[in-house]
Amino acid sequence: MSGLTIFSDEQPEQPLWQSRDAEEIQQQLTAIGVRFERWQADRELGENPQPDAVIAAYQHEIDRLVAEKGYQSWDVISMRPDNEQREVLREKFLSEHTHGEDEVRFFVEGAGLFCLHLNSKIYQILCEKNDLLSVPADTPHWFDMGSKPNFTAIRVFDNPEGWVARFTGDKIADSYPRLD
């Protein structure tokens, strides 16, 4: 089940607010300019689906985002617990960073933890199957896929080259709870 935990950016040991209610999560995130919606990831894709099959199954949803926001490209990221690069890839995005464009993810299966650093608070968003999250450009954040990642998500871009991580150098992410 999706979840949101809000912390002060000075007190990682004490949550200020928590919820697993999608409507409450959406209200909290909308207030800070972050899009969170529950979509239906109900297509049968089989085990270890190929990216083209995932795109084809959810083309209608992708087209909706493209029509709304003018995004120009999309792809699929899939991570499994047996991926030999899982530790390197996890570590890469566990440090606070920004992107020059929105970070849009639709979770088709599995889960991941997005942590946003806004307004002197940390917003930890547990995204699971059916969750659409759009983090605005230039928002300081980090992502934890867990020690045994198991997810498939559609990523939507303005420009894939613009999606380069710009690390802030802030070690704040080291102080907050991880996915596992």
Swiss-Prot record:
Residues the record marks as site: Important to generate the dianion: R105
MF annotations from Gene Ontology = acireductone dioxygenase (Ni2+-requiring) activity; acireductone dioxygenase [iron(II)-requiring] activity; iron ion binding; nickel cation binding
Instruction: Please state the Enzyme Commission number of this protein.
Output: 1.13.11.54, 1.13.11.53
- Which residues are tagged with the site May play a role in metal incorporation in vivo? E96
Q: How is the cofactor bound?
A: Binds 1 Fe(2+) cation per monomer. Binds 1 nickel ion per monomer.
Pfam annotation, one family: ARD
Name the source's superkingdom.
Answer: Bacteria
Annotated site (May play a role in transmitting local conformational changes), which positions? D102
Cofactor(s) needed for function: Fe(2+); Ni(2+)
Name its GO BP terms in alphabetical order.
Answer: L-methionine salvage from methylthioadenosine; L-methionine salvage from S-adenosylmethionine
Pathway recorded for this protein = Amino-acid biosynthesis; L-methionine biosynthesis via salvage pathway; L-methionine from S-methyl-5-thio-alpha-D-ribose 1-phosphate: step 5/6
Q: Which residues bind Ni(2+)?
A: H97, H99, E103, H141
Write the record's keywords in alphabetical order, separated by commas. Answer: Amino-acid biosynthesis, Dioxygenase, Iron, Metal-binding, Methionine biosynthesis, Nickel, Oxidoreductase
Residues given in the record as Fe(2+) binding sites: H97, H99, E103, H141
Query: Tell me, how does this one assemble?
Result: Monomer.
Q: What does this protein do?
A: Catalyzes 2 different reactions between oxygen and the acireductone 1,2-dihydroxy-3-keto-5-methylthiopentene (DHK-MTPene) depending upon the metal bound in the active site. Fe-containing acireductone dioxygenase (Fe-ARD) produces formate and 2-keto-4-methylthiobutyrate (KMTB), the alpha-ketoacid precursor of methionine in the methionine recycle pathway. Ni-containing acireductone dioxygenase (Ni-ARD) produces methylthiopropionate, carbon monoxide and formate, and does not lie on the methionine recycle pathway.
The record, for PANTHER family, names: ACIREDUCTONE DIOXYGENASE (PTHR23418:SF0)
Spell out the family assignment given in the record's similarity comment. Answer: Belongs to the acireductone dioxygenase (ARD) family.
Tell me the protein's name: Acireductone dioxygenase
**Naturally occurring in which organism (per UniProt):** Yersinia enterocolitica serotype O:8 / biotype 1B (strain NCTC 13174 / 8081)
Gene name? mtnD
